[in-house]
Amino acid sequence: MLGGDWNHTQGWFEDQWRHWTRAVCEREIPYAYTLGNHDDEAYLSRREIIELDMTNPNSLSSLYYQEFDGASNYVIPVYRSANSNEVVLNLWFFDSMDYKCYGVDGNGCVSRNVLDWFRKTHHQLTVDQKGVKRGLAFMHIPPQEFLVAWDVGS
């Protein structure tokens, strides 16, 4: 999993992206990318960054769920083996946006419509995958609930 905040100027992002993905490309390691809050501060939009990443044959990044806030909202099923149809884990990727959360300045957050998509998709995957599977979520800015739990120690 590659995280965001590859802040850039004209041409810089593409050069750095090729540099940082070279190691996984040479080893044919699949990876996915989630956006950070600084990624679209220069000349590429969030969508253009994911589209660039998707040109790498080892990238599992996706624009499947474009109707929601952000560009890196998707799920990747992990199978028991290369020859298996049994899903053992779902990797969830959420775009936590940039500097506003529900209109409040500060850190971004995963928007309500993405959370609604997650609930709906998780329910459908539970049916399709014949039961609840473990999951692991990736996002650049953690939900405020994580910070509260950290502060109170529970």
Residue ranges, per PLM feature:
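Extended hydrophobic secondary-structure segments that form protein cores and membrane-embedded regions
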Residues: 2, 91-94, 134-140
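Active-site micro-motifs of SAM-dependent methyltransferase domains
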Residues: 8, 39-40, 143
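N-terminal active-site segment of His-dependent metallophosphoesterases
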Residues: 1-15
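Active-site-proximal segments of metal-dependent phosphoesterases and phosphodiesterases across multiple
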Residues: 128-154
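Active-site neighborhood of phospho(di)ester-bond hydrolases with catalytic His/Asp-centered motifs
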Residues: 1-4, 30-37, 138-139
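Extended active-site neighborhood of metal-dependent phosphoesterases/phosphodiesterases
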Residues: 12-132, 150
